Amino acid sequence: MKETRSKQPDITPDMLLRAYSIGLFPMADSADDPELFWVEPEIRGIIPLDRFHVSRSLAKVIRRRPFDIRFDTAFSEVIEGCAQRAPDRPTTWINDTIRALYAALHKMGHAHSVEAWEGDTLVGGLYGVSLGAAFFGESMFSRRTDASKICLVHLVQRLRSKGFQLLDTQFTTEHLKSFGAVDVPKVEYEVLLAKAIASPNLDF
């Protein structure tokens, strides 16, 4: 995996969008480290939108509508949820610089959140970046069983309905593979990315 170190003051929202358009995304070593670095994986994770898979058990849960699913009503709160430590996530790479950059992208209409609510309580969500006909998933969190999974299902439904071509997950995990995520070589990913980026920016 290639990394390029860059001091955080150099990165602007416009630079961040440009980076996404050529296959780069930023990370930090920890929440307390102000420095960001660019990541360019040799193997990229994507979820082919036409091969997204929902298990029977999860489909059954979704039919019960356990959560109110909303879009872009609590973007900063979703990032905070993703930044919090959890039993399966003892450390986080989301620092103050990441928060500020993605908040700016949200105001520009390029960063979005999918949220699971129980009444007035946010119990799960995910966020990512839209550019052209591509959506780049960044992070997700869950405070109730299946909350983030259900947000992912609603994200894919939204992307399909709007005509998106690419859902980039950056890396794959066993969790994402259960939904149909696959690893693709960098060269193949670049072709998919170029096609999606060539599209006008789609409404999310």
Curated annotation (Swiss-Prot):
GO molecular function: leucyl-tRNA--protein transferase activity
Keywords: Acyltransferase, Cytoplasm, Transferase
Protein name: Leucyl/phenylalanyl-tRNA--protein transferase
One Pfam family it belongs to: Leu_Phe_trans
Enzyme's top EC category: transferase
Cellular localization per UniProt: Cytoplasm
SUPFAM superfamilies: Acyl-CoA N-acyltransferases (Nat)
Functional summary from the UniProt entry: Functions in the N-end rule pathway of protein degradation where it conjugates Leu, Phe and, less efficiently, Met from aminoacyl-tRNAs to the N-termini of proteins containing an N-terminal arginine or lysine.
Source lineage: Bacteria, Pseudomonadati, Pseudomonadota, Alphaproteobacteria, Hyphomicrobiales
GO annotations of cellular component type: cytoplasm
UniProt cross-references to InterPro entries, sorted A to Z: Acyl_CoA_acyltransferase, Leu/Phe-tRNA_Trfase, Leu/Phe-tRNA_Trfase_C
